[in-house]
Amino acid sequence: MLVKTYCAAVNGLDVTTVTVEVSLTRGVQYHLTGLGDEAVRESRSRISAALQYSGFKFPVADITINLAPADLRKEGSSFDLPLAVGILGANGDVPETHFKEFMFVGELSLDGSLQPIKGALPIAIRARAEHFKGLIVPKQNAREAAVVNKLEVYGMSTLAEVVSFISDKQKFAPTIVDTRKEFYENQTHCDLDYADVKGQENVKRALEIAAAGGHNLIMVGPPGSGKSMMAKRLPSILPPLTLSESLETTQIHSIAGKLGKNVSLISQRPFRAPHHTISQVALVGGGTNPQPGEISLAHNGVLFCDELPEFNKTTLEVLRQPLEDRHITISRSKYSTDYPCSFMFIASMNPCPCGYYGDPTHHCVCTPGQIQRYMNKISGPLLDRIDIQCEITPVPFKDISKAAPGEPSANIRERVIKAREIQAARYKDYKGIHCNAQMTERMIHQFAEPDEAGIDMLRMAMEKLSLSARAYSRILKVARTIADLEGCEHVELHHLAEAIGYRALDRGDWAERGHI
């Protein structure tokens, strides 16, 4: 007897419907075809025990199972449930009436309970696209999958419950999530606030510009100057996620298994801060079973790299292409996977190995050669991709001792949102362009072209600072953002002057300047 059930295979953000074909004939062999990985091949033992604990017997027959399409790799334990249901159907223990109506996904424990899986949200989106009536998932994944409307999502705890449901012996209510209500109710702001930061007004200004235009930024300063403190408060001034951004971000975290318990939607912009010992695979993604890396988990949010020179140099260099293209293609011998990674790159570093080069209160013990070698750990091509390079000095005691708090994040956020609204209106006809940092060269020429005086200033800066063509474009993008913050239609001379001032690390005399 031949029976078919349906499930899905996840490869990056791409999901393919998989047909599980189960045939029972005389014999005692178990054959599983269709390019399943080790977890899929091991499913026989889990299914056998789960059936026994659920009150069924594993068929004494020749069982042949095919996972179609057979040339597509299937990975993970989410195939346990459709395989078990298919075996029960082929053995006559469960009627096939509803098999064509539902997609099944879930891992089976030996006692028949269903364990959560990765990628429930993109699987639900695929199930709706394929016009399935419903999706049966482990209970822990139900709210995540129920974000997809026009699809009945049933969260089940055990295999026995699934059998009772598809046999019409027991009724279950589908999980219902009001997506918009849930999204806006949980869209809370960051608990940290720039009002807590005393002084450092120039750095706050740089961070405001970065947030307004989606620019990458690096802060250079001695220990204790507030680099990490200010970076961690950046989410408090970023514009809120849109619903479409939230769905896209949630899909990535779903695939990585990073969604919290009973979380249906990510409503805050991600803030990822990997340790400097991170590997290339953990940073950009990949592995034996392809998983999104930190750059994709930071999609639509912030990737913060503290103590940037302490990262492995080859690890940092793999950031160059994703920073430019805003997506990453992971190619291996057996697969190729694409992940989006449009994020703000924020970094911090000390100015020298001892950390106190240019500090007015501490003596630096590093030689000019040591300082330059330390700075050279960050390659020129990577620095070129960082729009804003900001120097930080320690806050004087008179500023620390002030009782008055700094400007609250809410005020800064209002200005950032207004600037983003200007950009959204400007780029509404350009697909995939939402902020100034994403402008193409043609768009820079159209929207950020300076006048003759501005061109003369840029020429002088290019010659004195030995700036690259990429740095030239970055300056114009930042100047456009400064103009948007001021509500100016055109890029003016003082906008360019401020933008040029944010290219501190392009100067070749860093180790001889003696100050920050």
Positions of PLM-derived features:
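The Walker A (P-loop) glycine that initiates the GxxxxGKT/S ATP-binding motif of P-loop NTPases
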Residues: 221, 285, 307
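Short beta-strand elements
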Residues: 18-24, 283, 387-390
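Basic, amphipathic alpha-helical bundle interface domains used for macromolecular binding and assembly
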Residues: 39-44, 59, 66-76, 289-290, ...
